[in-house]
């Protein structure tokens, strides 16, 4: 089926996944609040990432670094001088655009070139394309453009009681630097030998020129990043390892392979610190978008921090007796973007035999579903006994309890929020201590002893 963002955004708001930020005051451009179901979904995504990339990995450990860091961190990393996007304004609409994305949107939508990438083009090359193609502002319909110029993405604030340059600090634009500055702390305290990785989940902030597409590109966002350190010369082998590992993680959580692709950056597109980068992209309703960047950052970051701090980041290899600065592979995933991908991929409208109405169902992997099951008493007269099942199961799983409306409408509501199993407590349950368990995807129903529910759910929602 063809999916569109408007339908998915509407469902997200209607069912409590995502709300517009500051809604009662007219909102704030491109800010979003995760509702009761959205926070459960996103937390489950983060839990699944941490489980596979940290807890179950023989290589990796986790940290939680501060959002506010010494400004020298950003001087060393190059963010203060180089963390820029190409900005262009339309003189008639007064709207500001990111020039490379303006070109990419035009080429993909108007020319049908889904693989066109403007990242890596010079300002002159981008302006030439805009002029030659006659690209116009979507709002004003005119091609009355300013010149392209750099726009720094760092959010600046002040620490302390006086707002002057000596107290100037920045909201971090990525979580990676918190890992690099803690490299030696972690390596020594955990007695780690190469190869090993350090991962974290946390908020980052970028003053994006043209955020948009719901929670895909926002100014406040959450990252799930791993910095994996290895011996120089082994980085491409490890990059390939993490490409495969990350792709499999997505597939295991029910992302359709047809909606995924791996795209290698060409030489012009590579960041200044990288000798190889691959993006895992997802086909959203609005087009292909990056989910996961898997970059070989070489020894750039550790060397830069060594130069600026005076700290020695050389690793003494106990096997070869060599000393060298480790290379780093960075699989960087946006928690909000991948949550949106799971929302889009799970959404389906399907016909129901014997009914003229389609049912909307979210086919989440059970490990990601906000609720693992819903307990539904067939009648409110049965609620007192049915709530005991809720109390029993909710100590181990996220469980919904719903006693209002007909059982059919309750099934549809649970389908629409992605609950894998509905547990119906009926009048026979009072006598035989069994319940009817309905499967979300197949809609098949089986009778099951109440005593077996916990084991059943544990097996079904495992990841």
Curated annotation (Swiss-Prot):
CDD domains: GlyRS-like_core, GlyRS_anticodon. SUPFAM superfamilies: Class II aaRS ABD-related, Class II aaRS and biotin synthetases. One of its GO terms (biological process) is glycyl-tRNA aminoacylation. Its EC number is 6.1.1.14. Substrate binds at residues 98, 174, 221-225, 330-334. GO terms for cellular component: cytoplasm. Its main location: cytoplasm. It is found in: Cytoplasm. One of its GO terms (molecular function) is glycine-tRNA ligase activity. It catalyses: tRNA(Gly) + glycine + ATP = glycyl-tRNA(Gly) + AMP + diphosphate. InterPro entries: aa-tRNA-synt_IIb (IPR002314), aa-tRNA-synth_II (IPR006195), aa-tRNA-synth_II/BPL/LPL (IPR045864), Anticodon-bd (IPR004154), Anticodon-bd_dom_sf (IPR036621), Gly-tRNA_synthase/POLG2 (IPR027031), Gly_tRNA_ligase_bac (IPR022961), GlyRS-like_core (IPR033731). Homodimer. Catalyzes the attachment of glycine to tRNA(Gly). This is Glycine--tRNA ligase. The lineage of its organism: Bacteria, Bacillati, Bacillota, Bacilli, Bacillales.
